[in-house]
UniProtKB/Swiss-Prot annotation:
GO molecular function: 2 iron, 2 sulfur cluster binding; dihydroxy-acid dehydratase activity; magnesium ion binding
Protein name per UniProt: Dihydroxy-acid dehydratase
Residue numbers binding Mg(2+): 81, 123-124, 493
Residues modified to N6-carboxylysine: 124
Gene assigned in the entry: ilvD
Enzyme class: lyase
């Protein structure tokens, strides 16, 4: 039988000092010997997806203590990618993922906690906590803050749904009046919660359901809805059940690495492709797999992307549907159910929500197409109130009916899929020998094949200036390089360049290629994660203005139409620059010591932009 980790600091005469300190936190004599459950919260007033999390730790703690555990809460950081976007702050976003993972590990291991509840929500927080959970391998349950309600406003007497990206595009579009731009801005983000489309935050929170580490509804139940309260309480109860099974019954099947197996990662990626999730999820799944010691690679992602259809289309790929609509259609469990009926899902994997241990039983209960449970149907009818608020659980509105239309609804069956090609694709070729990622869900059909002329920039800032200044014209392939994990450093998101291409009427007239990454809010022919990155000697660092680039998404290829001999000549010339080789010589960018430390160990995107541990073992 596994011994409680916390016994290290609570048992024996030599731990008198530690017990004295535990008592000073409120632990009583009768509590010693109970499992200590860490609650990793990420409350902050900087981020709308986290502004309502202050009291969530206490809610989870109450359920833990009622079930016989000791709950101890701590906090970690959370960066708002939207607020950090378009300036030097974005350099810190991806590196914060590693910092979050480390901080959770530090707190849990320093205090010998027995199990963990992760209260996350936005872009790098869920991935960082996921990496920590798989690294620690103790019983864990994830519960997120939930998505924001979609913004809504009237323009030209027509009610439209909005999100953050709409506000950005409108602000840069000279055809939109100041009054309408301000109206969109004021309506785009009406409530607390993660941004309302299938952006990175919501994508990752959905993927925790598919990985088996969070409860049904975690990725789709609105932050404002009263029903979400039960998810926090159940997370506390559930983690205690897992802890008792592991420490009391010696049942290792409840541990994160037993749950998040290779098959579970395949399920998560299948969900991602089916729902057209953020391209950032590829980065984070690769990083999480390495922490879990699961051999899940870009090759696996490519294989899955070729066979899984696009079953759920959500903003930013369409203005019609947001996360509130995904929930009404049955949420993640409904998409997984359709994948199962298509023969594209492993249902024999473990899941924290299962009483018998398998995803199959979870689907039988929570797939709205299968279940007759009226409580489950009522749960998925939870809808928006349309009232601006920063308060969680502030409303109890419900849709009159579920969206169970699998022919023309938000979630489709395989037969009526939005496309038989999935929502993400891996491209490769001489421009990206180790691959790159495109969110095909957001690509216009006319752009699935594209050939254009390179317009090269060595920073996001220069690219923005070039787009807004009229340098970029129809037929160009905008290349933004030296923005990878090492070269940025920090692998900035390129939401502003893609948004400005749209606002200039070039959204379907140009392509954008980068060794950086894209916001989950990006759509259009935007190809990121080019690996190897320029700073690591990637071919993207050798592209010159005027070079022709061919993109073939159906053929999964991306080619720089320059001869091998010419590329060898350019590479030799670059290497001859010595210490200045593979660096953006025209760019002036202050880089802090913290970011330099990150850059020293950062790998390219095809490895998840994780740290190269071989450099630590040297």
């Amino acid at each position: 039988m596994a011994k409680l980790r916390s016994a290290t600091s609570t048992e024996g005469r030599n731990m008198a000092g530690a017990r004295a300190l535990w008592r000073a936190t409120g632990v009583k004599d009768t509590d010693f010997g109970k499992p200590i459950i860490a609650i990793a919260n990420s409350f902050t007033q900087f981020v709308p997806g986290h502004v309502h999390l202050k009291d969530m730790g206490s809610l989870v703690a109450s359920a833990i203590e009622e079930a016989g555990g000791i709950a101890k809460e701590f906090n970690t950081i959370a960066v708002d990618d939207g607020i950090a976007m378009g300036h030097g702050g974005m350099l810190y976003s991806l590196p914060s993922r590693e910092l979050i993972a480390d901080s959770v590990e530090y707190m849990v291991n320093a205090h010998c906690a027995d199990a963990l509840v992760c209260i996350s929500n936005c872009d790098k927080i869920t991935p960082g906590m996921l990496m920590a959970a798989l690294r620690l391998n103790i019983p864990v349950v994830f519960v997120s803050g939930g998505p924001m309600e979609a913004g809504k406003t009237k323009l030209s007497d027509k009610l439209i749904k909005l999100d953050l990206v709409d506000a950005m595009v409108a602000a840069a579009d000279d055809r939109i009046s100041d009054a309408d731009s301000e109206k969109i801005e004021r309506s785009a983000c009406p409530t607390c919660g993660s941004c309302s489309g299938m952006f990175t935050a919501n994508s990752m929170n959905c993927l925790t359901e598919a990985l088996g580490l969070s409860l049904p509804g975690n990725g789709s139940m609105l932050a404002t809805h009263a029903d979400r309260r039960e998810l926090f309480l159940e997370a506390g109860r559930r983690v205690m059940k897992l802890a008792k099974r592991y420490y009391g019954d010696d049942d290792a099947s409840v541990l994160p690495r037993s749950i998040a197996s290779f098959k579970a990662f395949e399920n998560a990626m299948a969900l991602d492709v089916a729902m057209g999730g953020s391209s950032n999820t590829v980065l984070h799944l690769l990083a999480a797999a390495q922490e879990a010691e699961v051999d899940f690679t870009m090759d696996d992602i490519d294989r899955i992307s070729r066979k899984v259809p696009h079953l759920c289309k959500v903003a930013p790929s369409t203005p019609k549907y947001h996360m509130e609509d995904v929930h009404r259609a049955g949420g993640v469990m409904a998409i997984l159910g359709e994948l199962d009926r298509a023969g594209l899902l492993h249902t024999d994997v473990n899941h924290v929500a299962s009483e018998d241990g398998t995803l199959k039983s979870v689907l039988e209960r929570f797939d709205v197409v299968l279940t007759k449970d009226e409580k489950v149907h009522e749960f998925f009818r939870a809808g928006p109130a349309g009232i601006p608020t920063t308060r969680a659980f502030s409303q109890s509105c419900r849709w009159d009916t579920l969206d169970d239309d699998r022919r023309e609804g938000c979630i489709r069956s395989r037969e009526f899929a939005f496309s038989q090609e999935g929502g993400l694709a891996v491209l490769s070729g001489n421009l990206a020998e180790n691959g790159c990622i495109v969110k095909t869900a957001g690509v216009d059909e006319s752009n699935l094949k594209f050939s254009g002329v390179a317009r090269v920039y060595e920073s996001q800032e220069d690219a923005v200036a070039g787009i807004l200044g009229g340098e970029v014209v129809a037929g160009d392939v905008v290349v933004i390089r030296f923005e990878g994990p090492k070269g940025g450093p920090g692998m900035q998101e390129m939401l502003y360049p893609t948004s400005y291409l749209k606002s200039r009427g070039l959204g379907t007239q140009c392509a954008l290629i980068t060794d950086g990454r894209f916001s989950g809010g990006t759509s259009g022919l935007s190809i990121g994660h080019v690996s190897p990155e320029a700073a690591s000697g990637g071919t993207i660092g050798l592209i010159e203005n005027g070079d022709r680039i061919d993109i073939d998404i159906p053929g999964r290829s991306i080619k720089l139409l320059v001869s091998d001999a010419e590329l060898e000549s350019r590479r030799a010339a670059m290497n001859a620059k010595g210490p200045l080789a593979w660096k953006p010589l025209s760019r002036v960018r202050p880089v802090s010591m913290a970011l330099k430390a990150y850059a020293m160990l950062a790998t390219s995107a095809d490895k998840g932009a994780v740290r190269d541990v071989s450099k630590l073992e040297g």
